[in-house]
Amino acid sequence: MIELKGTYNQDCKIFIDEVETEAIELVRNILNQEISAGVQVRIMPDTHVGKGIVIGFTMPVTRMVNPNYIGVDIGCSVTTFKLNQRIEKERFPTLDHAIRRSIPMGMHIRKEKNLDDWWIIPYFETVNNNLHAFQQKWFQRFGETKGSIQVDKEYISRLCKKIGIKESTFYCSVGTLGGGNHFIELGESTKDGSHYLTIHSGSRHFGLKVCNYHAKKMHKTTVLPEEYHEEFKCITRDTLPTSDIPQKLEELNKRYHVGKREYMLEGEDMYEYLVDMVIAQTYAQFNHKAMAKAIFKDLGENYQAVDTVYSMHNFIDTTDWIIRKG
């Protein structure tokens, strides 16, 4: 196990003995920021370098958030279904073709004329329940009562306009796989030979737009402290010879991390981001449900799931306030 300490955090553990240097530096960067102050930071043993953060990162939410910690694949999850019976090997090629036909992959989404909208009303009901639970937790944590949120088609229309995504893309991306490391897999148990269907996907382009919208806001919500401006004035006013000013300003900027500083969301900006996170994470869950519905239709009426495990691994849990980067 590796233990790390930083400027703001003295309690970080990585549950493995050897980690790549770049991953260590990414973790140290977070420990040197106020966002990690006073909480336990725990890094899973399969950790490796991600985009701006390590995979396997877990930390309680503090009074600020960084949308880039979770990134664009909000709500990325794995669902595994244990099938009630095995699938004959002779069916594999036909089934593979059927799934590729019924589940858009890569950059592709469904066409509006083929949209199966069975999921929309249950989605609204679920996301509203999740938001209600989140608002209760927000009040318990911060003592702030927020106005009621009712997600419906009109709300989604405003949200899509805000983050810059077409409404048709929002609705037609449900039931689509995406690319990267997302997959649909048929597995076999080495114990009893049972077959398992596994789906790995997230919130698609909607999640990307949510992340990018809030990440851009970070640059507007935090300003340099007054001490920086006072020192800046002193340097430009009192430094002699004046040829030394550029070097002194460079040292000042380095000390305050100007140009490299991690800007965080706080207060209302943090609240708005977490609301959108709840919406996107629930969206990812229904994306899985829609794909499963299509695949079981391809399998035929004789196939059902006798057990199901759904696990989200890239999310912010807004009920127990945990950040999980997977």
Write out the residue ranges for each language-model feature.
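Mobile "lid/hinge" segments at catalytic clefts and subdomain interfaces of large enzymes
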Residues: C76-K82, G207, E227
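Active/ligand-binding-proximal structured segments within catalytic/core domains
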Residues: I70
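Domain-length cofactor-binding catalytic modules of enzymes
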Residues: I2-N29, S36-I43, V49-M59, R63-P67, ...
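Short coil/turn segments at secondary-structure boundaries
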Residues: R110-L115
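Metal-associated gating/positioning segment near the N- to mid-region
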Residues: V78-T94
